[in-house]
């Protein structure tokens, strides 16, 4: 079997691809835990297919992998505790994105800005997802810190919009 060679190997491309594989793998593991038998069976198959790529990425970037693993377990703990603080709930996602973003550069000055950009992008992503899923989470009884705080959907959406705008402003600041 002939293995194709990379036309243009770039270390940042390798890093971002590895970061994506590591993130997706851990998200799949989380989905398996949170899902019913049929859905988890499908994701177990996906995890099995992804495992060789995950092992390769983990060997290249062990600190990134252990950081993502740690923050994913923190996210699970926060959800299991039914944490009502939006700031605490979005912190693990923000830290994961910060960790990934700062790994793009070796320059300490760049790392500082990339870390902040990644952090606020993660915060933005978590709050936007919580806002988008609000009605579905209420219907299915899933964890959603917006609903735990507000009970009124419109009030929760308004709060989310304000926080999303703040995060977008911070992203622009770090950009």
Where do the PLM segments sit?
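Acidic catalytic motifs of isoprenoid enzymes
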Residues: 3-116, 123, 127-165, 173-175
């Amino acid at each position: 079997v002939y293995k194709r060679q990379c036309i243009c190997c770039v270390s940042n491309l390798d890093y971002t691809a590895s970061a994506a594989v590591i993130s997706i793998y851990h998200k799949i593991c989380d989905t398996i835990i949170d899902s019913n038998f049929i859905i988890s069976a499908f994701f177990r198959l996906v995890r099995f297919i992804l495992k060789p790529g995950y092992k390769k990425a983990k060997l290249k970037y062990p600190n990134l992998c252990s950081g993502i693993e740690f923050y994913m377990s923190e996210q699970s703990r926060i959800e299991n505790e039914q944490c009502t603080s939006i700031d605490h709930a979005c912190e693990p996602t923000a830290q994961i994105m910060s960790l990934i973003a700062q790994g793009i550069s070796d320059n300490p000055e760049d790392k500082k800005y990339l870390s902040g950009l990644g952090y606020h992008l993660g915060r933005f992503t978590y709050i936007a997802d919580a806002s988008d899923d609000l009605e579905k989470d209420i219907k299915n009884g899933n964890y959603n810190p917006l609903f735990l705080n507000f009970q009124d959907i419109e009030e929760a959406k308004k709060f989310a919009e304000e926080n999303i705008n703040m995060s977008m402003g911070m992203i622009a600041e770090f950009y």
